[in-house]
Amino acid sequence: MKKKYLLIFTCILLLFCLTSCSKQETENPGETVVNFLNALQQQNYASAKAYYSENLDNLPNFKNKIEAISPSVANELFSKLADFSYTIKKVEIDSNDPNKAYVSVSLQCYDLGTAFKNTILDYLKTDLEMTFDGAKDEEIIKKAEETILTDISKSEKSFRRTVMISLAKEEGTWKLNKISENHELLNCLSGNIINTIDEMSKEINTTK
């Protein structure tokens, strides 16, 4: 069971591995981005698929996996991920290709990266302490869940970035290009978790 909780941390990277498509007419690339981000805020992934050129099925599938382990952790995590605000700054059609566009978006998200790092450290500390104290696995698991919930709930909506979103017109419909290739947007939508994982990996490799 403890491995399942560690899975929550390590599998978050899969959250935004987005790879299929659905058709819905939109007038301009700015409107497409607005509709896509609004759908993510509402956790309406079926609607979001209409504005995205790849597959979003990994998002609800991942959420279901987390819910199977801990409904309370899944609810808190996905509520924070969805609770971002944004402002469209600029919409630009590629002067060399009218089927390509770029939308600049200012995003404000919960800093879940800090929560993620704290959760890893707090979980390992709690696990070791309770193990040496002779605690049962059930007790350690319960405490781990409490630790995760506390760290996520304490996160603040303080992460701000302006990112460029690229789109392409497919059969007269504007759609976002593959987000997994847009590191800055991916990191924002993850609440800075992606960059935090990268930084932690570098720290670990440096100490080897």
Which ranges hold each PLM region?
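Positively charged n-region of N-terminal signal peptides that target proteins for export
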Residues: 1-5
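Sec-dependent N-terminal signal peptides
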Residues: 6-13
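C-terminal motif of bacterial Sec signal peptides marking the signal peptidase cleavage site
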Residues: 17-20
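Bacterial signal peptide processing site
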Residues: 22-24
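Short, aromatic-enriched amphipathic alpha-helices that serve as compact interaction elements
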Residues: 27-44, 51
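Hydrophobic beta-strand residues in large extracellular and virion-surface proteins
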Residues: 33, 86-91, 103-105, 165-167, ...
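Short solvent-exposed beta->alpha transition segments
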Residues: 49-128
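Low-complexity, intrinsically disordered terminal/linker segments enriched in charged
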Residues: 121, 127-208
